[in-house]
Amino acid sequence: NGPNTVLINNESVRDLISDLKIKNDVLYPNKNNNKRFLIKKGKLIKIPQSFGQFIKSNILSLSAKIRIFFEIFIKKSDNSLSVYDFFKKRFGKEFHDVLIEPFLTGVYAGNTRKMSIKHVLKKIWEVEQNYGSVILGFIKKKSRNITPKSFNFKNGLSDLTNKIHQKIKDKIRFNSKITSISKIENLYEITVNNDIKYRCSKLICTIPAYALSEIIFDEKLSQTLKKISYCPIYVLHLGLEKQKIKNDISGFGVLTKPSDNKSFLGIIFNSRIFPHVAPSDKDLMTVMVGGTRQEQLLKTDKDLLFDKIVRDIRKLISYDGRIIMKHDFLWDKGIPQYGLDHDYIINEIKNFENKNKDFHIMGNYVNGISVSDCIEKASVVSKIL
């Protein structure tokens, strides 16, 4: 019910795989099924995978395609805009609505009008700031970039966490609810289960912002962390009869935009990416529902919501078979949102860390929400300590 893949987009991920000696266990997606889909006029449409494909496709209107090339003449932003305002300014509204909004809905499940471009798409923001143009900046940086590559394991990403557990299991304490974090002189005191106390000089904290805000000794930080909102995500796994799917779904998945009026944010075609996860005559897919766009939908009766989702999927992929498997899970507080006040929040966290030596806050609400982001942050802090 968590991440479906991890992206190798930094050296820390490579180093972790090497340290755990699991390089031979890594599975990469089926190269023949690397397409991504959007919806246009109720039908699946492939996202172009090259500049040539993009020019020939009808994914954007001709005027929207022409508008993109004017990006190189637009002055860089003076301050941090929302994702919506940034892309509307540099590439045009249609580019945002058709390509950017569905993508970020799939990652953050949030509202692009309330997301900070500086923190949500940090690399794009930095390229614009450094080169004055996103297009020109990426052309100049292209040769230096690591080509991102996603991966998984035979039994899912639990293989990764299990390997980490095996390596450090003697140092882990399970079933331990932290009820307070205090500071006594130059030491930090952690109270567990309202009873057991631990004292340490160095502390790394990765718990969610809403949880840390309730137990931290610093009132200002507590109030700051409460400003971070989390959106709910309903995850639904479905098993289908492969031969009854009439439309081509040989790809990674499909993302939706608000105007599609679907009952889900996106679908991942799990068994098309990693064939081993389902029998050869079956298909496994993961449906994502909720986020800031569909919070009201999650208040619908669960059975009615399921029926609506299945109806939408049947129509989209032209499926007349049975639903042979169903498993679902609701994350009430699924994904932290990097809002327009995130600059202030990050600065307050840094101020706290500066005042409290060797206290490191490293949740996924700081400098990236992905697994690879968290691995990179952990690597950086481990070297500091």
Predicted regions and their residues:
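Dinucleotide-binding Rossmann-like beta1-alpha1 core, especially the glycine-rich loop
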Residues: 1-75
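Conserved flavin/dinucleotide-binding core of flavoenzymes
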Residues: 48-52, 249, 266-385
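Short, well-ordered alpha-helix to beta-strand connector turns
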Residues: 168, 200-201, 356
